[in-house]
């Protein structure tokens, strides 16, 4: 039987949440793009609520480990609604330049609205680019630092994403990648699953986004451990790679130097 794709009006992709006929998990790039478009209106508030504001600390650590400094030209990959790009902007100041890249129009629209509401002059140094992390529209060796928050786990081809990051980084520069930690400690991974099943998904279901947040647990299961992420970075050609567990082991950060 031919594959049946259901579309809901005004959505950018197939019907995934609240859809009785939903059959496959969020596998393709366009399904993931549709998911992030759908959750954009509530994404920031849910992150604050679900992490009790802790994600702000993890994002600050990510920026600090990227080595970004005043005057730098930096890239925030999979920038979503812009949290990390705004932090980078304060770091590189008005004579620096920040590019926030994402493939979700809705997330970028939230980022751009937030930028307009901010009063600090440095925030004018941010440019939002709609693009694909797997095919970056930048020349080789362009950036002094790159950050990526909760992005690598969500791209369909992690190897290509890391190769693209390496390509657009200057020699000696760093990428700092924040994400959920796929822990090898059974106590930590059970606690993470417990939080997702009993807090994250029930809260999200109150916004009609149960299926979209269920994807989170599957994506962590299919992600790489810290050791595997270090290996991936070295395999694609980074000269060094170090993984740090943070947030009590729930989160992790990969720092790799070109
Ligand atoms: C930062 C959070 C979520 C980001 C996020 C990432 C994704 O890839 C998604 C994909 C699809 C849908 C949504 C998302 C998404 O929102 C929130 C993280 C919340 C944690 C699961 C729970 C944190 C629990 C504690 C309150 C933290 C305690 C820390 C302490 C130091 C032990
Ligand atoms: C969980 S959000 C993280 C947003 C933000 N970095 C943060 O930390 O809050 C993941 C983001 O990755 C983006 N994304 C996933 N795959 C992508 C790809 N191939 N190219 C560009 N953006 C992508 C999604 O659109 C989404 O905005």
Predicted regions, residues:
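Hydrophobic beta-strand segment of the Class I
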Residues: 43, 146-147
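Short beta->alpha hinge that forms the Motif I/post-I loop of the SAM-binding pocket
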Residues: 103, 157, 180
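N-terminal, positively charged/glycine-rich alpha-helical extensions of SAM-dependent methyltransferases
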Residues: 2-44
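Conserved alpha-helix/loop element of class I SAM-dependent methyltransferases that forms part
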Residues: 52-73, 83, 87
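Class I SAM-dependent methyltransferase SAM/SAH-binding core
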Residues: 73-136
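Core SAM-dependent methyltransferase catalytic element
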Residues: 236-258
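A short glycine-rich, Lys/Arg-flanked "PGG" loop and its adjoining helix->strand segment in the class I
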Residues: 159-174
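C-terminal alpha-helical "lid/dimerization" subdomain adjacent to the S-adenosyl-L-methionine
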Residues: 30, 120-122, 178-236, 242
